[in-house]
């Protein structure tokens, strides 16, 4: 059982009220928890300007999820987000673990030699 760290960025429609945004965030947070994700943390960044229009909107509500899990949660939550009209875009990333300083220094010395 290999546990990895993941980051999931979601952009919600800007015309959702605070209550609806809270419902969507809670829905996906519970979804992750119920599907064996650990240490789920959520940061709502709020309404931000988009780089380009998505569905004729210039703004979007950004939500960032960080969690640890085996990976089976990703396919399930992405499927649900594709079917949800309130989600305009999403991106999930597997985070690489930080290497200890000793390994970094040893690698740097090996490259120099």
From Swiss-Prot:
Family from the record: Belongs to the bacterial ribosomal protein bS6 family.
Gene3D superfamilies registered for this protein in UniProt: 3.30.70.60
Lineage: Bacteria, Bacillati, Cyanobacteriota, Cyanophyceae, Synechococcales
Xref: NCBIfam families: S6 (TIGR00166)
InterPro entries named among the record's database cross-references: Ribosomal_bS6 (IPR000529), Ribosomal_bS6_CS (IPR020815), Ribosomal_bS6_sf (IPR035980), Ribosomal_S6_plastid/chlpt (IPR020814), Transl_elong_EF1B/ribsomal_bS6 (IPR014717)
Biological process, per Gene Ontology: translation
Name recorded for this polypeptide: Small ribosomal subunit protein bS6
Role of this protein: Binds together with bS18 to 16S ribosomal RNA.
Pfam family, one: Ribosomal_S6
One Gene Ontology term, aspect cellular component: ribosome
Keywords: Ribonucleoprotein, Ribosomal protein, RNA-binding, rRNA-binding
GO molecular function terms listed in the Swiss-Prot or TrEMBL record: small ribosomal subunit rRNA binding; structural constituent of ribosome
């Amino acid at each position: 059982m290999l546990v990895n760290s993941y980051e999931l960025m979601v952009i919600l429609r800007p015309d959702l009220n605070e209550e609806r945004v809270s419902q969507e965030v809670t829905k996906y947070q519970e979804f992750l928890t119920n599907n064996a994700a650990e240490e789920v943390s959520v940061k709502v960044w709020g309404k931000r300007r988009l780089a380009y229009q998505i569905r004729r909107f210039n703004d979007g509500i950004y939500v960032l999820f960080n969690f640890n899990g085996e990976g089976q949660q990703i396919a399930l939550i992405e499927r649900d987000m594709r079917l949800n009209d309130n989600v305009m875009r999403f991106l999930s990333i597997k985070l690489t673990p930080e290497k200890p300083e000793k390994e970094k220094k040893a690698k740097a010395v090996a490259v120099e030699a």
